Structure formats: C-alpha cells, structure tokens
Amino acid sequence: MVTAAVLVDCAGRVLMQQRPAGRQHGGLWEFPGGKLEPGETPIEALVRELHEELAIAVHHADCSPLGFAATPPGAGARLVVLLLYGCRRWRGDPVSQEGAALQWVDAGALSQLALPPLDVPLVAPALGFAACG
C-alpha cells in the first residue's frame, strides 16, 4: 500500500515530484508520498513520507482522503493500492530531501504531465480538491 498527497498552495498549484531515473517509471511525475511501513496507518505513513521526502510537517487532521487507485487484477504484477489525500496546510517549504525534482504545477496542467499509471485516474479527484480552495 502506498499513500500520496495533493499539496495545494495558496495560488492553487499542485506540488509534483519526479521519479528518479533508473527506477520503475523513472522520469515520470507523481504526487509525493510513499510506502507504508509495518504497523503504520495510511495517514501515519503519509505524514512520515512528506517529512522525509520534502522536509515539511503535516498534521493528519489537515489531510482529506480523495480517492484510491489499484493495479488491475491479473496484470501479472504485484497488487499496489495508492491512497490519495489532499492537503492545503503544512509547516515549512517543500524541499526535495532525496534528490527528486519538484515542480509546482497549475492544477489544470496536471493531465498534461507524464504520470505513472496509478496516478492517472487520480488526476480528477486532485483537480476537484485544488478547485475547492
């Protein structure tokens, strides 16, 4: 299981993170987040991952569930479930801690980015969240 966040700034832009070259889906843009560790809830993993990857502090109460996507059954790959949360409040300025490129994107341009397959169906809920600000 994986969690990710739609981080929306006061200008309505969404923070996207580029996957490292040499890894699966390398070079594609994704919502920041990461895998759950044993014993963690999804929201605990999201708060931890955003701190580790972006050096920001997010409170779980400031994150709203937006949707999920999963690898299709029988695709020959292991099952991956991606839980997406929306967040407008955090402390600190996002700075990549793992060398990944970051970019603030106008919400309307999300669908123009090259995204990993699991992120594609989550663009619609991300747009809805970004528009509600």
Predicted regions and their residues:
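Conserved N-terminal beta-strand and adjoining loop/helix that marks the start
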Residues: 1-14, 35
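NUDIX/MutT-family hydrolases
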Residues: 84-86, 94-126
